[in-house]
Amino acid sequence: MQTILHTQQVEEQERFSYWRDAICDVFVKLDASQLSPHTFTGRMETGSLKDIQISEVNADSQRVVRSNRQIQKSVEDYFLVSLQTKGQAYIKQDQREARLQPGDFTLYDSTRPYVLHFEQPFQQIVFQFPRSLLLAAVRRQNKLPAILNPGTQHPVTTMVSTLLRTVASSYLHLDSITRLRVAETTLDLLATALTTISGVKLNEVNSMANVHRAGARAFISTHLADPDLTPDVVPSAKGFPPAISINYLKRKDNPSLL
């Protein structure tokens, strides 16, 4: 099930107020300000994949702030991963900054203050994970480094960006068993990528191999029903090593092994 929120549902003078309330309801409590004097337009499509909330956001320029005051009053406890798909974004948390171009992604934490700044109209896909879920996946007890933006040239970026786009466009059409599997493999790839980028794993070769394996598993899980899925399709489409793709495709007839 997906919820669609659009500012055209209300009168022009009420649109940004409606939008501010909507993003607080969908994500966490925030302060938001409009950056353009023109009538504001925004649209969100929000759904869930097991414990992961997925939102596609298309909106005009704005500035969003998560303050200490709001954090102290809330019980919200999430990590958010934003994938930029159109326009640019500026994000700041813990004295770290990132400027996102289309294809870039970044991680930030709802339990610490942050600023999101969108100078122009933009599009993003936002994955919202329970904080405890992602920390357990990366085997960290309390925190992850904020604002991880490896840049579009980093090999991890292409795999994570491709996976997030694929999951966001297909999760509503999957059966319940496949949805569970895709949620697990999405978390697996993201956790592996984050530990690789943040330097938690010191062996670069092993770290990238883990990323490739998680990526291949995630891609195959979302395409199990495709009769054209072969060992050649996965590496050519997503840049995974053929040996890894073949290894996981051997398990296609037994999805519980994926």
Curated annotation (Swiss-Prot):
It holds the Pfam family AraC_binding_2. InterPro entries: AraC-bd_2. It comes from the Bacteria. This is Uncharacterized protein in nit 5'region. It comes from Bacillus sp. (strain OxB-1).
